[in-house]
Amino acid sequence: MGARASVLSGGKLDAWEKIRLRPGGRKKYRLKHLVWASRELERFALNPDLLETADGCQQILGQLQPALKTGTEDLQSLYNTIAVLYCVHQRIDVKDTKEALGKIEEIQNKNKQRTQQAPAAADKEKDSKISQNYPIVQNAQGQMVHQAISPRTLNAWVKVVEEKAFSPEVIPMFSALSEGATPQDLNAMLNTVGGHQAAMQMLKDTINEEAAEWDRLHPVHAGPIPPGQMREPRGSDIAGTTSTLQEQVAWMTGNPPIPVGDIYKRWIILGLNKIVRMYSPVSILDIKQGPKEPFRDYVDRFFRVLRAEQATQDVKNWMTDTLLVQNANPDCRTILKALGRGASIEEMMTACQGVGGPSHKARVLAEAMSQVTNASAAIMMQKGNFKGPRRTVKCSNCGKEGHIARNCRAPRKKGCWKCGQEGHQMKDCTGRQANFFRENLAFQQGKAREFPPEEARANSPTSRELRVRRGDHPLSEAGAERTGTSFNFPQITLWQRPIVTVKIEGQLKEALLDTGADDTVLEDINLPGKWKPKMIGGIGGFIKVRQYEQVAIEIFGKKAIGTVLVGPTPVNIIGRNILTQMGCTLNLPISPIETVPVTLKPGMDGPKVKQWPLTEEKIKALTEICLEMEKEGKISKIGPENPYNTPIFAIKKKNSTRWRKLVDFRELNKRTQDFWEVQLGIPHPAGLKKKKSVSVLDVGGAYFSVPLHEDFRKYTAFTIPSTNNETPGIRYQYNVLPQGWKGSPAIFQSSMTKILEPFRKQNPEVIIYQYMDDLYVGSDLEIGQHREKIEELRAHLLRWGFTTPDQKHQKEPPFLWMGYELHPDKWTVQPVKLPEKDSWTVNDIQKLVGKLNWASQIYPGIKVKQLCXLLRGAKALTEIVPLTKEAELELAENREILKEPVHGAYYDPSKELIAEIQKQGPDQWTYQIYQEPFKNLKTGKYAKMRSAHTNDVKQLTEVVQKIATESIVIWGKIPKFRLPIQKETWETWWTEHWQATWIPEWEFVNTPHLVKLWYQLETEPIEGAETYYVDGAANRETKMGKAGYVTDRGKQKIVSLTETTNQKTELQAIYLALQESGPEVNIVTDSQYALGIIQAQPDKSESELVNQIIEELIKKEKFYLSWVPAHKGIGGNEQVDKLVSSGIRKVLFLDGIDKAQVQHEKYHSNWRAMASDFNLPPIVAKEIVASCDKCQLKGEAMHGQVDCSPGIWQLDCTHLEGKIILVAVHVASGYIEAEVIPAETGQETAYFILKLAGRWPVKMIHTDNGSNFTSAAVKAACWWADIHQEFGIPYNPQSQGVVESMNKELKKIIGQVRDQAEHLRTAVQMAVFIHNFKRKGGIGGYSARERIIDIIATDIPTKELQKQISQIQKFRVYYRDSRDPIWKGPAKLLWKGEGAVVIQDNSEIKVVPRRKAKIIRDYGKQMAGDDCVAGRQDED
């Protein structure tokens, strides 16, 4: 009888009773049919409980079907009934029995087909299991074949560059993504990085240098290649420009192999290192907020530089906590200090938004900030599903609402607060049974079940449970604390039917707890009192019952009084009328999914941050919130054995009296392992495939549905304090993912993916896009079937503890998803409304531009250039900006565009992608990506000027790169381009200027604003045209300059300039030559800057002078521009150089000064680096630094670079446990030598230095000005060991930055091993061993020991090579060419071989046979005079 009572309930029962017995008939299925079917199954020896599930019905149908042909009519009726029941369980919409039988037959046929296809699919899968992990794999024939790099990898690389912007993290990410790649794959990765031309040019230069070095070290063997042997790769082959893919695979898989992919990858990483250094040249100490700089911009600069800092994570955390506040401007600093140490970055940015003006404004804001609500950081509370509205708190002592008895200020009422009698307290009152458990309850098992701890529940397989909680009158807090068991509620899981023993008017009965039943119905019980007859809809039809009022019922010691019905019910039922009185709730437990293991960072312990004091109001609010969370199993109480703590606080919700609990997890986040975000971006609707049926779901209480790893829970401990320390604080820890913890997003995404995986496999026809807690579900099923699948998905998620609230379940279009509006056959952005304003502030315009940028992805033609021009310069957010005429016109055009709604189409994989680009006006481009005309998948705009001097072709290539990157991300492939440019113009540009080998597939489209090149540069000198040697010079101090030219026909002209620079004078000289010359001209310059601008063929520029040069170039018929190195004795160049330098240049003519100045302007390198890199005297290198205004910071010490030469050590004394530790650090490697010395004297220090010099090559020591380091003993030791000693800047710890940092690191390690050693000196040596041998990191992932050995080993051959080079460079070579009998020279000797020499003549490197070369020693330029500095500098 039990099975008959619980086969169907709720919505399924309603669906059952709507199905007709026959098509067109009147009779419908009723519960009596299920009762009959249950009895019939018992006759056939089948378990009636199988009727409760779809799988059970399927098993019954499988047993009955073979007997149908020979069975009776009753057997056929039974089969029909179970077939209809199966459809109800599966939520298949049927109207009658015949339709249900048809559906069953259809399902059975599909199952047969799957069974037949399974072996074939298994064979196919076996054949296709080729490794996808590496680009080169072995096929079935044993041949090595290449797999193209996947769009997913390219997408990840593009995201890395876009998000990290060449910060140091880019290099290991590139290395990981390019594992095993061929040069062609590596070029594909480089070509997807479109918007970083300067960085790509640097990378190209590095690759060219490395390729040339490869060719020098691997000369080509003379003679033909033997048959069957491959040629050896040249540098350009390794770079993938002159080799085919087949050759690359053959080299990489040959015997012996030549790993061209790894070699090319190494070159790229060298280039990336240079780029990273260029993008991160600033010290974190220099990052200070300007007086009017927005706080948001300051924070961006701070963290961008912080990521590039070479420091430990602890140091970086300290910098974030202290330097960020210290270096803010005074107004922001006042606010930040008022916020306190608990403030997050988001709170700081909210507080400091728009700050400026007088200091009193900052104080006012700081006071107001105490009431600011940060909704984004608030921790969402997850309520139980069936608890009803939250009850207001009422005092049991005075009877007033708003506080509890524990906090009541009224005189304490005598006696019991429940019954009023004296002699006992409320918790002992017999009228209220506070303790739910007794020694023996009338359970079937004979004992009361205990409520398991939260840890067990979190991993239990239950999908839902019943729990009895407190009644309508809550216990006082004092009572709850005294009883100690008020939260150990009975728990009944629903894996079995919830049948318990209850006491009704003293009689014991077994009854089913049924939250779906309205009334309590019992059978075979005699109750006292009057009754009245009643008819109710029961199991098997209507039944007649007797209704008794005011019946006493007791369950688990809880008493209730209510109405009871007595009649012929198949099972005794306790309905909602009694359960609600007892506080019984239906609870969804924490997800039973497997927890993700989480650890702390190596060597770190959990947070031990003290709880700061809280107001009484906040303590009360937190106590209530935590009680609710504990009931729901999200947190658990802990004892004093847990030593960890994280501070908590509470803030009020905006426009509400309710409170939010916030936990300051910053310290735990610093100590928690790092996580990789499993999703690199949000999905775009243009990449969605068109689906017949769509639904959008939202997962409720997402984080609180996923359990936290059991071993990690202790680190989330927090404490609720008491007012005036009245009682010890209440301690809790989290059982679920906490809000604000760094691991919650990644673990939730990973868990959700695992949960959805089986559903995706079982339902391949259903597409699910998952982003955090938003789910987009699409299919080509009919709407009824689709909704059944949605219900299956919701049920699947519910089984794992994830609820999908009905109010956020979108069933009908349009669907609002991720900021978009989705329709069945089209999509658009959610409606964009532009505000109408008389006056616009900076903040208004920023929001307006953001809206227009968002709308531009589907509304073609939107422009924002003029609006963005209004935001130039550092302006306050509240500053009113007048609109220019151009901006007003642009805004009016955009309003017109947005009036008509525009929709995008969905992606069809069977059709090709087409991208069409149009030029809208000056520096503004729009594009559309579509598959069918007039049905755009996506539109966009481009209006960036990436360089000051550009032209339309260059901008068009940037647009193409942007579209290609977008397409790879969204669709995984590159579209065919339709470009407004002639084929000849396009191909000319790509041939001359593109930095890599990839050219997209494209075709010409004749739309307005055709792109063209306005002038053409000749590639060879023009015969018969006059040659102009041009040059310019300027004095940095006086800003005076000269520009001029000298021609090969004797003409010359020099003009004086004021308020100019070296770069401007070089351009002015070219402009002068263009003005004075005829229609055809050759110009020779020694300026790389000017050459780079003009070779790019710009047709517009931000510089007025460059625009004037462009106008002159357009007038020329032919124009040739060449570059020669400065100060090399080249005739015309040397003449014009002397003319323009007269009275202008102060610095001597030394080879490398110009390059050093250019590099210093870019990188602000120190004088030592320039002296080394460009072979300059120290006095000249220091003069360059001294003349740079950015390197002379007023009122501040100069922050130079740490000298990392191989022989430099920093020494310092530090103190621990009252003893002195002398520490020496090898600056370049971080290797440590340390000892405990008896006294801080010169003698002990000198002995330590000599011992250090006996172990390692020490050339220089850098110390502070302590008396022991300045002593005569130390000076004597340094003199004897030939060690140079330098001293730091007094009272400036940064001058000893390396050793100071290592002191902290050493002390930290000593603290970790101190309990293992009896004496401090032992612990110091243990810590030194750990640091040098057991800690790896930095470049290459080496330990300090490996790094110092590698540095010394590399330094020895480098010095030997330098000796050989210096010997060779003392010689000069005079030589003859094969056809020219005249001797040329002198040239530099680079290498001398048996049969030939390699020489450098000017900038050209040549190979000359020994018989045609004369090698002589160079004795200097005697003609120039002995004291000619210029002459001496030309000697190498």
From Swiss-Prot:
Pfam families the record matches: Gag_p17 (PF00540), Gag_p24_C (PF19317), IN_DBD_C (PF00552), Integrase_Zn (PF02022), RNase_H (PF00075), rve (PF00665), RVP (PF00077), RVT_1 (PF00078)
- Annotated residues that bind Mg(2+) 1 are located at 698, 773-774
Q: Region Interaction with Gp41: what ranges?
A: 7-31
Residues covalently joined to lipid (N-myristoyl glycine): 2
- The keyword S-adenosyl-L-methionine is annotated on this UniProt entry: no
InterPro entries, per database record: Aspartic_peptidase_AS, DNA/RNA_pol_sf, Gag_p24_C, Integrase-like_N, Integrase_C_dom_sf_retrovir, Integrase_C_retrovir, Integrase_cat-core, Integrase_Zn-bd_dom_N
- Report the residue ranges that make up the Integrase catalytic domain in this protein: 1202-1352
Q: Which reaction does it catalyse?
A: Specific for a P1 residue that is hydrophobic, and P1' variable, but often Pro; Endohydrolysis of RNA in RNA/DNA hybrids. Three different cleavage modes: 1. sequence-specific internal cleavage of RNA. Human immunodeficiency virus type 1 and Moloney murine leukemia virus enzymes prefer to cleave the RNA strand one nucleotide away from the RNA-DNA junction. 2. RNA 5'-end directed cleavage 13-19 nucleotides from the RNA end. 3. DNA 3'-end directed cleavage 15-20 nucleotides away from the primer terminus; 3'-end directed exonucleolytic cleavage of viral RNA-DNA hybrid; DNA(n) + a 2'-deoxyribonucleoside 5'-triphosphate = DNA(n+1) + diphosphate
Q: List site positions: Essential for RT p66/p51 heterodimerization.
A: 988, 1001-1002
Matching entries from SMART domains are given as: ZnF_C2HC (SM00343)
Ranges spanned by the short sequence motif Nuclear export signal, renumbered to the chain: 16-22
Residues marked Cleavage (site): 134-135, 365-366, 380-381, 435-436, 443-444, 489-490, 587-588, 1027-1028, 1148-1149
Chain positions covered by the region annotation Dimerization/Multimerization of capsid protein p24: 279-365
Q: Annotated motif Tryptophan repeat motif: location in the chain?
A: 986-1002
The zinc fingers classed as CCHC-type run over 393-410, 414-431
Stretches the record annotates as RT 'primer grip': 815-823
Q: Which residues bind DNA?
A: 1371-1418
Outline the segment boundaries, as ranges, of region: Dimerization of protease.
490-494, 538-544, 577-589
Q: What is this protein called?
A: Gag-Pol polyprotein
Species in which this protein is naturally found: Human immunodeficiency virus type 1 group M subtype H (isolate VI991) (HIV-1)
